[in-house]
Amino acid sequence: MKNMLFIAVIIFNALRVSASQETLIHGNIESGGFGGPVFKMGNIYHEAALMIGGRGGWIINHQYMLGAGGYALVNEIPSKQWANYNMDLGYGGIELAYIQNPDKLTHLSFMILLGGGSVGFTEQGRDQWDESQDFDTFYIAEPGVNLILNVTQFFRLGLGGSYRFVKGVQGDSELVSKDLSGPTLVITLKFGTF
């Protein structure tokens, strides 16, 4: 009888502990996903810069996003050291986001990109892989905030800002990390199930 009572107490305590356990994501997990183009405008190396890329991700319970993104410089930024050379710049990484009130017509999302990239200067008219000057790689952390508009059930439009924190650029003579760091205006088109 004592053994039965002892076992009943242990089972009751185990059920009570498991019922009160707190987790970040609780209940049934709802999944969605999205992808789409991203346009970034800002200053790089004291010049106006336009970067185009894309991002995609897994949306968990309509509020958390785990994904990836990649971006490349599309306009010409000339070298200040070598005549007829323009900057080649690209970066990417994992992206994490929290989406606040995703069911509202307009809402905010807070995100961060953590990754790496490369930068160098390529002679005009030549492929970037032929010959680059002052080529280097770097680490990047880019936190941002976006105002999101729910256009349709499957389309979201975002307008926001981010800041590129770049570290590790140690070019021979022309570029340093602060030349690539700075604020950015971001326009995002997202297609998927949210």
What are these regions (language model features)?
Residues M1-L24:
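Bacterial Sec-dependent N-terminal signal peptides
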Residues V17-L66, K190-F194:
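Short glycine/proline- and aromatic-enriched beta-strand/turn motifs that initiate or cap beta-hairpins
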Residues G27-G33, H62-Y64, K104-F110, Q153-L157, ...:
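Outer-envelope beta-barrel architecture signal
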Residues G33-G35, L50-G54, Y64, G90-I94, ...:
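Hydrophobic, lipid-facing positions within transmembrane beta-strands of outer-membrane proteins
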Residues G33-M41, G54, A68-A72, F110-S118, ...:
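Transmembrane beta-barrel strands of outer-membrane/channel proteins
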Residues V38-H46, L73-K80, G117-Q124, F165-D172:
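Sequence/structural signature of outer-membrane beta-barrel proteins
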Residues Q63-E142, L149-V151, F191-T193:
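Gram-negative (and chloroplast) outer-membrane scaffold detector with strong preference
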Residues I148-F194:
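Predominantly the C-terminal beta-signal and adjacent terminal strand-loop region
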